[in-house]
């Protein structure tokens, strides 16, 4: 059960019996009183990149769904056959045309009750030219630290968190 009290299923996926709330492992979970099916809510994993060039960070302006017109870090969900790092590189290339190398984990973000964990990597461009994926973004641009869009123009809380981590990042001293 999500923290909001909503079940993902209303009926058992095995036998179509209406699900009931049952306390399992200290949480209310949707369960089938006939076959015993119990749903455990799992977290999705997203992988984003903070791509820096000439002191600016790369953001994409989304062009779909409720976040249409808002800015986000390049990234997306991790597929079940790839690592976090592979997903971060793949999503960045798909959304921006840039191939990137990852320079390390910058931050993670998760909010209880919101079923996603986002891992955010520092990255630099190794090849490619800027081009947006028209099915995902209307534009992409580099923003200097003092010109990053304000919070209300950002698509996700994880974007704001990643940008805060980028602003605060200090490279290790040799």
Each predicted region: which residue ranges?
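Short cysteine-rich clusters marking metal-coordination/redox-active sites
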Residues: 12-15, 32-35
């Amino acid at each position: 059960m999500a923290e909001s009290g909503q079940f993902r299923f209303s009926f058992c996926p095995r036998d179509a019996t209406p699900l009931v709330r049952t306390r399992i492992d200290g949480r209310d979970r949707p369960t089938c009183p006939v076959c015993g099916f119990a749903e455990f809510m799992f977290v999705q994993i997203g992988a984003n990149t903070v791509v820096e060039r000439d002191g600016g960070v790369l953001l994409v302006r989304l062009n779909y769904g409720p976040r249409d017109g808002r800015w986000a870090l390049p990234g997306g969900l991790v597929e079940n056959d790839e690592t976090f790092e592979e997903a971060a590189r793949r999503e960045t290339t798909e959304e921006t045309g840039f191939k990137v190398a990852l320079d390390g984990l910058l931050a993670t973000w998760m909010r209880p009750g919101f079923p996603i964990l986002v891992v955010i990597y520092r990255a630099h461009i190794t090849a490619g030219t800027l081009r947006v994926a028209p099915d995902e973004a209307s534009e992409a641009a580099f923003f200097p630290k003092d010109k990053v869009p304000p919070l209300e123009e950002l698509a996700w809380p994880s974007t704001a968190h990643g940008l805060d981590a980028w602003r605060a990042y200090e490279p290790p001293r040799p």
